[in-house]
Amino acid sequence: MQYEYHCFFFIADYHSLTTHPNPENLKGNVRTVLAEYLACGLDPEKCTLYVQSDLPQTAELYLLLNMHAYVGELERSTTFKDKVRQQPDNVNAGLLTYPVLMAADILIHRAAKVPVGKDQEQHLEMTRTFGNRFNRIYKTDIFPEPVAFNFGKQLVKVPGLDGSGKMGKSEGEGNAIFLSDAPEVIRKKVMRAVTDSGPTIPNAPKPEAIQNLFTLMSIVSKPDTVNYFEESYNNCTIRYGDMKKQLAEDMIAFTAPIAEKIKATLADTALLQKAMAMGKEKAHYSANETLKLVRSAIGFSV
């Protein structure tokens, strides 16, 4: 993608503030995610890779877009409803306006295509709403309508280990396999994955938790391995313990080369600093161009 498009990738440390992270943990997480991006192949020479909080223009656009975002539409966000249910004691304004900040992340660079998972498509639709609303109110065409760039049928939502939802840092430590997890950590997490007592009817539909395990296996295991356990499930002889042991070893083999690269990259402070500085400069140029147009349209001095 980075060789075919003018790509922007960022580390979303503003977004993480809704969970009130410890400052030292936040700093370490930013460094780790940057190393992970680089280890997975992002090239700071080919794309713009930056830290969200290094771009105050995003915060300004977030503020300006909030002036035309309505409480009712924000409360209808599926993600907001989920968070209210999951953490009723921490329903803060940042959670409510999360889609507006996501819109600012996208619109600050006037992005045309956004790599987005299916669970975030509602937020992309809200981004189009906010951008179009701004254009209409101020009689301008500053913001394009961004569309999903999701590789079509090749798109796979990586499921979590808890039996439902997606795999992600925000969903809980035990729900996700991190690229830098040690082999013993991966084994423990996978062996704790949710299962049931097993099928009793041949070729029965798989419950969500079981389908999740098969989806994970389809990502990291050989086709023959997947087929073996598919057949075992369909003829009701499957042993989930054996399946999870195999899945854990295949995950370890899949993540090990990346984990080694992450470790080496984290040790190279000069490389990390250079990547952040390069990305910050390129992101500032793009964001400043957008904000000039936005401020002029609103009537602010530029």
Predicted regions and their residues:
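Short, histidine-centered active-site or binding-site loop motifs used for metal coordination
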Residues: 13-15, 112-113, 171
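Non-membrane alpha-helical structural segments and their capping/turn regions in soluble enzymes
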Residues: 24-27, 31, 121-124, 273
